[in-house]
């Protein structure tokens, strides 16, 4: 009873903080960056991280197993993974671009997970026999950590593409008036400065996208391999090509292609960012979209209206 009450308290606290953070982030986005608001949002993110950690711990105690058995629980763990990456980025103090991505991801994922939309899925039940294994923590946690890192890296690539293809403003190129000429040269100076800043920003986005996706790819690979071993123990086959396994393999292939393109200088930047952006969509199909189908060996993670 105490654990259940604590779980509800932590859920409401995390949802309240997330609601406040959304307001703060929107205020920072619509206006110039305000130092105090930014610091408040960062502290709020740290509090959210500890709240989600406490929520996972109370779930674990209350349910008797690590909370990764259905979509609702995995969404909470996904938001925790985003918050973990954000906390690491925050304490390194040189990855502001990554922090911006991870904070938004944490806010919206946790907000969705605790908003009540998934109320039907949040009803706790006894684990199905296939999930009553020590492999549950290793396989599912590594997969979701991999998804979180890959999603963050992909969003950095999406930002890179937006900045790259954004059209620059047109400047006066012909003017006999002294005032217009002066304005022209000033704008050329600003234009060159902006181009330099834009180039530096693109390079930084490309660098961090590569670093984060590389980390996520390692988690994804180990997660798939551990899942294959677990599948052999549970179902007698390492691979069954059910929808979740198939899309996980497609996700792995897409990001393997991304890492390959990063090895060639001619394909770095925009080309690799396009691949990562495709990967962003593939991950959501694998993680969320397949659950709408409710078919295959992983149907226990589906929406209640679609699983049999």
UniProtKB/Swiss-Prot annotation:
Record membrane topology: Multi-pass membrane protein
* InterPro entries, sorted: Cyt_c_assembly, Cyt_c_biogenesis_CcsA, Cyt_c_biogenesis_CcsA/CcmC
User: What processes in GO biological process is this protein linked to?
Assistant: cytochrome complex assembly
For this record, an example GO cellular component is: thylakoid membrane
The places in or outside the cell where this protein is found are: Plastid membrane
Keyword Membrane carried by entry: yes
Positions of transmembrane segments: 2-22, 44-64, 71-91, 143-163, 212-232, 239-259, 273-293
One MF annotation (Gene Ontology) recorded for this entry: heme binding
Q: Name one Pfam family in it.
A: Cytochrom_C_asm
UniProt keywords, alphabetically: Cytochrome c-type biogenesis, Membrane, Plastid, Transmembrane, Transmembrane helix
Q: Does the keyword Transmembrane helix apply?
A: yes
Subunit comment: May interact with Ccs1.
Q: Its biological function?
A: Required during biogenesis of c-type cytochromes (cytochrome c6 and cytochrome f) at the step of heme attachment.
The family this protein is said to belong to: Belongs to the CcmF/CycK/Ccl1/NrfE/CcsA family.
The protein's name is Cytochrome c biogenesis protein CcsA
Q: What is the lineage of its organism?
A: Eukaryota, Viridiplantae, Streptophyta, Embryophyta, Tracheophyta
């Amino acid at each position: 009873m105490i654990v259940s009450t604590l779980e509800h308290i932590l859920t409401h606290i995390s949802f309240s903080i997330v609601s406040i953070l959304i307001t703060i982030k929107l205020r920072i986005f619509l206006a110039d960056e305000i130092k105090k608001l930014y610091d408040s949002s960062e502290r709020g993110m740290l509090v959210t991280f500890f709240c989600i950690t406490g929520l996972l711990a109370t779930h674990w105690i209350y349910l008797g197993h690590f909370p990764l058995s259905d979509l609702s629980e995995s969404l909470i763990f996904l938001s925790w993974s985003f918050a973990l990456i954000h906390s690491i980025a925050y304490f390194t103090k040189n990855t502001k671009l990554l922090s911006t991505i991870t904070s938004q991801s944490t806010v919206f994922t946790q907000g969705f997970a605790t908003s009540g939309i998934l109320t039907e899925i949040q009803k706790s039940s006894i684990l199905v026999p296939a999930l009553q294994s020590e492999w549950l923590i290793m396989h599912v946690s590594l997969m979701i950590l991999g998804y979180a890192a890959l999603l963050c890296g992909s969003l950095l690539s999406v930002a890179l593409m937006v900045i790259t293809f954004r059209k620059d403003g047109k400047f006066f190129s012909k003017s006999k008036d002294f005032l217009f000429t002066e304005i022209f040269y000033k704008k050329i100076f600003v234009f060159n400065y902006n181009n330099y800043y834009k180039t530096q920003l693109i390079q930084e986005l490309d660098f961090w996208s590569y670093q984060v996706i590389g980390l996520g790819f390692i988690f994804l690979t180990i997660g798939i391999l551990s899942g294959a071993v677990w599948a052999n123990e549970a179902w007698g086959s390492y691979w069954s090509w059910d929808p979740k396994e198939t899309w996980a393999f497609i996700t792995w292939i897409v990001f393997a292609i991304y890492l390959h393109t990063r090895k060639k200088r001619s394909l770095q930047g925009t080309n690799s960012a396009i691949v990562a952006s495709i990967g962003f969509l593939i991950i959501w199909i694998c993680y969320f979209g397949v659950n709408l189908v409710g078919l295959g060996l992983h149907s226990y993670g589906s929406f209640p209206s679609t699983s049999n």
